[in-house]
Amino acid sequence: FDKYKVEVLEKSVRPPRYVGDVYGKGDEGKEALMDLKFTQDAQGQLWVWSLPEIWEDEKVTSRYLTVVDVGGRSNKADWSVIVVFDRYWMMEGDKPCVVAQWYGHIDIDLLAWKAAQIAKFYDNSLLVIESNTLETHDKERDTEGDQSGFILNQIRSVYKHLYARKQSAEDIKKKAPKKYGFH
């Protein structure tokens, strides 16, 4: 990265308002998305600058966007990162802003469920999971084969706001299954 551009960006960095995590009744499956709540914990992996704003008298559709960069589970691997963007001010011509960020080392299937919990907590936001890592066959990445279809379809069965790639006319004609995740 250009160090001068990084220095400019650093001036707008501020500490999170809250640190903790989002929890449901379970860690995976339907229960993971039930009774979600944010719990403050100084050791938590979710940094929150703004909790979700959901108004009863007004609905802002597609306000939040949750994006996942899949890392690895070992300490030597890249960090996995889940970022939530608030796109509300884009209606006024402004830029989206980061309202929450989770980072850590975690098994890929649990990362996907954690991302679904955070996305649901942020008003059922669109969940975009980077699938390059999930679909790679690079032995250095420690993905243990191609689990992407299984993991993303498992999430899709309980969380309907999962990003799917645009299908070609040929795939539609063949009735090929949707490919979830950003590649």
Regions found by a protein language model. Give the residues of each.
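RNase H-like, metal-dependent nuclease domains and their acidic two-metal-ion catalytic environment used
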Residues: 1-171
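Domain-level recognition of nuclease-like catalytic cores that cleave nucleotide substrates
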Residues: 172-176
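Conserved motor-coupling elements within RecA-like helicase/translocase cores
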Residues: 179-183
